[in-house]
Amino acid sequence: MPMMESIVTFAGGNEKALDTYKGMRDYYFHYMSAVEGKNGYGDYDNTVSLDEKEIKMHNALLSEVERVSGCPKGDMSFEAWSMSPQVKWATFAVVNAMIDAVLPDTLIKSIGIYTEMYQVGFGETLEFEVQPNSLFTVSKGANAQRTAFNKKQFAVNKTMQAVNHQITVQTQLYKVLSGKENLARFVRKAVISVEREMHKEAYQTLSALVANGSFPTALKLGGYSAEDAITLAQTVEAYNNGAKVAFLGTKKAIYQMLPDASKGYRMITDATNPQINIVRGIFDWDIIEIPQVATGDDRTYGLALDDHSVYVLSLGAEKPIKGVIEGSTLTNSNDFYDTADLSSNATMNKRYGFMAMSNTVMGVITV
């Protein structure tokens, strides 16, 4: 997706600076594909190795710190250069901009299938007007009848406010500036951390929507059968005015929807390359995996997403979950020279929130 306007403004029209933020995206996409095995985040240059990119990005980030701080290192030692308050401020300002440059692409990949993301400025709230999904009543009438059943539709207005979220990490200025702690690696881990938490919150909002007592029972299936799933999919599709549906769930949830072995599998035979393929859809309806997310608890090694729910959504209709990001990432920290080991606690602040708000009809299957 295009670079955010705030990043372009932060670069100040400097093409070299803008290339640094584009390079961070390239490095991140390469890492997610080569190390995490997650493709589709975005295109990247595969002619340069990941290790080489990491070193180049670290140096490019330090150059950007020089530009933003207005304090070029020149022939100064790292110790002397790092004493400048401007250098410390610029380091985290650049890190914040790097996070904002990469994060939108990661969100589209992980939650974009069911979440619509919006960006607002600091101090702003997001306002929505939800239009009714129902159609007008068509009735038979005699030749002399002047009016039929009168129907008036009303839109619903909703407001949404972001909530501040924080990450506190300890860094050592000397190690960062001397290359012992890689800035590119630090940014990458920060992006993954924020994206994981946003993924969990967006999914929890979706899960809470169908668990709500007011969610129609006609759109819930307790247990899976092909016939009932087809009926539910047809219902959702019809009430969304023909918008094609898809089945969404974690890999384990989707697995329980695969064809029964006793009924046979779909087999593709070719004289040169015979193969057996897993069915990727049901009657031309797609089956889409929602990537599972770790809870982050290394005592239980739990998973955050429900492995027993499959959601039936119309992909062409309005998305059921809305997300908002307020402003850009901000960081506050104590001074490195307040501690003997030149360490600093840096707290990154990211304001975002999610809400279930849509006129679309959706269903859920418990498997």
Protein language model regions, located:
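Intrinsic-disorder-associated interaction segments
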Residues: 1, 10-17, 21, 50-54, ...
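Short, charged/polar micro-motifs that form catalytic or ligand-binding hotspots
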Residues: 47-51, 55, 76-89, 173-184
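Sequence/fold signature of self-assembling virion shell proteins
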Residues: 54-58, 263-367
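Short amphipathic alpha-helical coiled-coil/interface segments
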Residues: 58-61, 91, 95, 187, ...
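Assembly/oligomerization interface modules of large self-assembling protein complexes
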Residues: 76-165
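Alpha-helical scaffold segments that mediate packing/assembly in large oligomeric complexes
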Residues: 164-239
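Extended, solvent-exposed, turn-rich assembly/linker loops in the middle of proteins
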Residues: 211-283
